[in-house]
């Protein structure tokens, strides 16, 4: 069956087929190789891309900007402090303005409904750079990274996600694994599992792709024999420091530490994290938490010994944000 990603939105990956996702992965690989060998060709000259950031960002902003510049496109960075978004102008009206000036729009912010409203009214492709519910651009980078660090085909790769699984990373890792036929394991307290409706949809995708989906409250059972262990921060951006107490109580058994990595029984297991990571107390937030919870001074969701070990491929993963976002831009906007 033919497919066409040109001028398509990227909002959650739900509307992308397995074949389309594999195409994005292959294009990411090819563009990465071209950048490394100095043979990259610019396909986006004359394109203008708006980057809306209602949440702060390091990797997503840098990845979009460098990817666009490499391909000859121009970008405009827009945040709440430098625009009328949400203050004097609705997202609906913002979409109708920006859609007349730009060839595409990236949005990083809060509710999924906001990026969907933006896509509905902009009239140009919209890319979800992160919402509370989904993180699709991160997923393409994560799977590319897993493929680079495994000699197995995708359908034989297994990975576990530990921690708050109802957040954008838990939802998205479940979704893309189900779409690509992978062995996906989610380990979290039942109260923090992905919502039932998403789980049911992913089970349907798994029936089509051959994926294996496991949800469990047992972290050691989840990681047994896996190729990759993923985690994320226990409190998401924008949540108050007061929320940490209950979350730490819930998630301490799901901390990725040396004991947990050993319990995989696989010496080749790699550790992945979308970053930023609280793996020590050298950050402002890490220091605040360590003062209240001294046993977390050497790491919250992941301990420093794991993060600084050869098993950690989080920085390769971070670099791949740029290559995969470039593939998304090129496949959507270029005439290939």
Curated annotation (Swiss-Prot):
A single BP term in Gene Ontology: L-arginine biosynthetic process
GO cellular component: cytoplasm
Upper taxonomic lineage: Bacteria, Pseudomonadati, Pseudomonadota, Gammaproteobacteria, Pseudomonadales
Record keyword Transcription regulation present: no
Positions contributing to carbamoyl phosphate binding: 57-60, 84, 108, 135-138, 274-275, 321
HAMAP family xref list: OTCase
E.C. number(s) listed in UniProt: 2.1.3.3
Pathway named in the protein's UniProt entry: Amino-acid degradation; L-arginine degradation via ADI pathway; carbamoyl phosphate from L-arginine: step 2/2
Organism: Pseudomonas putida (strain ATCC 47054 / DSM 6125 / CFBP 8728 / NCIMB 11950 / KT2440)
GO molecular function, one term: ornithine carbamoyltransferase activity
Keyword Transferase (UniProt): yes
UniProt-annotated binding residues for L-ornithine: 168, 232, 236-237
Main location: cytoplasm
Compartments where found: Cytoplasm
Catalytic activity: carbamoyl phosphate + L-ornithine = L-citrulline + phosphate + H(+)
Family (UniProt): Belongs to the aspartate/ornithine carbamoyltransferase superfamily. OTCase family.
EC category: transferase
InterPro entries documented for this protein: Asp/Orn_carbamoyltranf_P-bd (IPR006132), Asp/Orn_carbamoylTrfase (IPR006130), Asp/Orn_carbamoylTrfase_sf (IPR036901), Asp_carbamoyltransf_Asp/Orn-bd (IPR006131), Orn/put_carbamltrans (IPR002292), OTCase_ArgI (IPR024904)
Function: Reversibly catalyzes the transfer of the carbamoyl group from carbamoyl phosphate (CP) to the N(epsilon) atom of ornithine (ORN) to produce L-citrulline.
Keywords associated with the record: Arginine metabolism, Cytoplasm, Transferase
Protein name listed in UniProt: Ornithine carbamoyltransferase, catabolic
